[in-house]
Amino acid sequence: MDKVKPKSLISWLLFDLANTVYAFVIPGLYFSVWLVSEKGWTDQQLGFATSSAMIIVAILGPWVGRKSDGSEGKKRLLLLMTIMCIASTFLLGTFNVQISVILFVISLIGFNLGSVVYDALLISVSNEENRGKISGMGVAFGYMGSLIGFGVATVLQSLGYSYVEIFRSVAILFLIFSLPAFLFVEEKFVSAEKVKISILSSLNIVIKSWKHSRQYKGLTRFLVGRFFYADAINTLISGLLAVYLVEEAGLTPADSQNILALAIVISIIGGYIFGKAADKYGPRRLILISIFCWIISLSLAIVATEFNQMWLIYVTGVLGGFNTVSYTHLRAHETMEY
């Protein structure tokens, strides 16, 4: 059994805390509300900006993944993506709204590509016996980051600070909490080979891998199924949920923040539970349970708004918090199983 230094593990966990501060405050809540409620953009325009970022991530993701595989270069790639995200987040709202949206797209690209590399570093801080548990701890740390980001943003807002100043505070928090990962995480040696590959070549590898996947029972179904449910969940938690609560459900920004805070608390508890359960039962069973619970949650949200049963929104918040943590935790673990 490979032994991991506590300093390396804690530093890896702190990065999860750092990037979840960003994920919750910027795309998850404040930027989307600022763009739609303050600047008059529509949720469709927000969705288009988010989709544009995701298309670029889909193109560059295989290249980033290939570059980080088979060599000790993950931390360098993670540093590049993190700087991209932090710098563009710090500048949000500094210029006009159009440039701010472009910066938002850049920050999303940096965040998501960084997550690809960060997930790959899981093998450097865990072994086969405790990988699910460590991943679950990472998610729990991540949602602690959401609470920190939520707390700082709420205090700043109550003191009269602007959205722009909240954006900058998030960038600073991301920087502070991510630094230990670059200083203390020790990468496991895989290969001294330096991978040189173009973006086009990486896409060709993806196409060939897709064709090759048909030789493995269940893998094609897994990839197709994951695409559909992951796309739906990413769309929901990357800003449209906060806009829905304010614009469609008619809640105040304060009420929507309370619901999301409730979901975070549930997520922290669920992170450890799902980590232990994944080690015992495997990610496949838990993913099926999670998808079923997502269907129930979204159905309750529709009923709540159609029949003006706002108490159901809070029930949805509880289920959504548990579902979100299951999805986030199993994202890395399930991929390794296949």
Regions found by a protein language model. Give the residues of each.
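Juxtamembrane intracellular "pre-TM" segments in multi-pass secondary transporters
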Residues: D2-P6, F189-L223
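Helix-loop boundary and gating motifs at the non-cytosolic
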Residues: K3-M54, R221-G225, D231-E248
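Helix-to-loop junctions at the C-terminal end of transmembrane segments
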Residues: G61-E72, G271-G282
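Cytoplasmic membrane-interface "Motif A"-like loop-to-helix N-cap segments
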Residues: G70-T82, K280-I291
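C-terminal ends and interior cores of transmembrane alpha-helices
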Residues: I83-N96, C293-E306
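Hydrophobic core of transmembrane alpha-helices in multi-pass small-molecule transporters
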Residues: I99-L113, L312-V325
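Glycine-rich segments within core transmembrane alpha-helices of 12-TM secondary carriers
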Residues: S135-G151
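Conserved small/polar residues in nucleotide/adenosyl-binding loops
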Residues: T328-E337
